[in-house]
């Protein structure tokens, strides 16, 4: 049986993560309050941020920036600002 959480990002009950994917207290908070669906949305935004801003995950400042963006996205309802990115429009 799948574990469910009250996802703070989606604002609904949804399937939770299978295990804690991020270390520390923030990882516990994510595990307890973020759904698989919301985490997948974050991962796509994270990939775009890393690529567009050319972040180096060996650099402490870049990791801190990415963590701040993650908290803003998942818990504070702020969208990720990606310079130069224009969402694809649906053709009607």
Swiss-Prot record:
Pfam families xrefs: Iron_traffic (PF04362)
Alphabetized InterPro entries for the sequence: Fe_traffick_prot_YggX, Fe_traffick_prot_YggX_sf
GO cellular component: cytosol
GO MF term (any one): iron ion binding
Name of protein: Probable Fe(2+)-trafficking protein
Any one GO BP annotation for this protein: cellular response to oxidative stress
Family recorded in the similarity comment: Belongs to the Fe(2+)-trafficking protein family.
Function text: Could be a mediator in iron transactions between iron acquisition and iron-requiring processes, such as synthesis and/or repair of Fe-S clusters in biosynthetic enzymes.
NCBIfam families according to UniProt: PRK05408.1 (NF003817)
Keywords, in A-Z order: Iron
UniProt superkingdom: Bacteria
PANTHER family the UniProt entry points to: FE(2+)-TRAFFICKING PROTEIN-RELATED
């Amino acid at each position: 049986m799948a574990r469910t959480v009250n996802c703070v990002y989606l604002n609904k009950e949804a399937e939770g993560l299978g295990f804690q994917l991020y270390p520390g207290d923030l990882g516990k908070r994510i595990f307890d309050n973020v759904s698989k669906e919301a985490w997948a949305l974050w991962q796509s935004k994270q990939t775009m941020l890393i690529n567009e801003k050319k972040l180096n995950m060996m650099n402490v400042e870049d990791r801190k920036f990415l963590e701040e963006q993650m908290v803003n996205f998942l818990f504070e309802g702020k969208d990720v600002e990606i310079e130069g990115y224009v969402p694809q429009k649906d053709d009607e």
